[in-house]
Amino acid sequence: MSKECYFTGRKTVSSNNRSHAMNQTKRVVKPNLQKVTILENGELKTVWASAKALKKLPAGVERV
């Protein structure tokens, strides 16, 4: 199971730190993922979901 949002597909991306002199170094930007149990089509599933997705769960999906 990868660290990717089950609903939105958000995952870790790479970005740059920028200093005042505009030097750049690589860094990692991670989404706010929570491990949650959901009830989907009568089945219990444990999935990674972003905090934003948990605010607006799709129809037919219930958090347990």
UniProtKB/Swiss-Prot annotation:
Listed InterPro entries: Bacterial_rp_bL28, Ribosomal_bL28, Ribosomal_bL28/bL31-like_sf, Ribosomal_bL28_bact-type, Ribosomal_bL28_sf
Keywords: Ribonucleoprotein, Ribosomal protein
One Gene Ontology cellular component annotation held by this UniProt entry: ribosome
GO biological process: translation
Stretches for region Disordered: 1-23
Source taxon at top rank: Bacteria
GO molecular function: structural constituent of ribosome
Coiled coil: none
Disulfide bonds: none
Gene3D superfamilies assigned to the protein according to its UniProt record, in alphabetical order: Ribosomal protein L28/L24
Keyword Ribonucleoprotein: yes
Biased composition regions of type Polar residues, renumbered to the chain: 11-23
Listed NCBIfam families: L28
Family (UniProt): Belongs to the bacterial ribosomal protein bL28 family.
Full protein name: Large ribosomal subunit protein bL28
